[in-house]
């Protein structure tokens, strides 16, 4: 604790208990999201740990027909690890599947290659959620690759500071040249 130095252990079970206590509609399993690395062995160990935590999270979650429990696919930029992670999660059984460990330093091309490599293996009848992605080009590219859901602080942060995204690029809507502009932002740039 930052208050008194007391140690707290956040286990997969405790994470589920907290999220249920918050009355979350979608509950996420605990996972380990390693830095963007090319170290296959490190990514594999992290993926295996995340799969074990997903199993424990599912047991802790129990059956709840009014809430959704999402598994988080890990595996870095390695297609075989992503597919193995996804298959582990499918075997456990979840209401939806999130893709974690992307948008953490890799290029957009690398992110799209991961999505292209896994999209045909993801259950079509379940929601597909790409975590931490919020730029318009990332969202559009991910939707083309079968992703349904996104979350990111960037759109809110951008809007709060007056940054608007248009088909012609970003504009700072608070600039004086837009003071009397009556055009939609998509026409303003």
Q: How should each PLM-predicted stretch be described?
A:
Residues 60, 64-181:
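Glycine-rich phosphate/ribose-binding loops and adjacent secondary-structure elements
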Residues 184-189:
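Conserved small/polar residues in nucleotide/adenosyl-binding loops
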Residues 1-94, 104:
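Active-site entrance/lid segments in N-terminal catalytic domains of soluble metabolic enzymes
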């Amino acid at each position: 604790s930052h208050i008194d130095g007391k140690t707290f252990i956040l286990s997969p079970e405790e994470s589920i208990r907290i999220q249920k206590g918050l009355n979350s509609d979608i509950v996420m399993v605990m996972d380990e999201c390693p830095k963007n690395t090319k170290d296959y062995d490190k990514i594999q160990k992290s993926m295996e740990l995340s799969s074990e935590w997903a199993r424990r999270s599912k047991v802790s979650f129990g059956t709840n027909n009014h809430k959704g429990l999402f598994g988080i696919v890990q595996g870095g930029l390695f297609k075989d690890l992503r597919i193995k992670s996804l298959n582990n999660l499918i075997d456990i059984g979840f209401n939806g599947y999130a893709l974690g460990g992307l948008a953490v330093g890799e290029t957009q091309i690398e992110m799209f290659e991961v999505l292209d490599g896994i999209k045909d293996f993801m259950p079509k009848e379940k929601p597909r959620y790409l975590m931490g992605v919020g730029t318009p080009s990332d969202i559009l590219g991910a939707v083309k690759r079968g992703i349904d859901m996104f979350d990111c602080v960037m759109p809110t942060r951008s809007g709060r500071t007056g940054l608007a995204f248009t088909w012609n690029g970003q504009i700072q809507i608070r600039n004086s040249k837009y003071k009397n502009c009556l055009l939609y932002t998509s026409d303003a740039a």
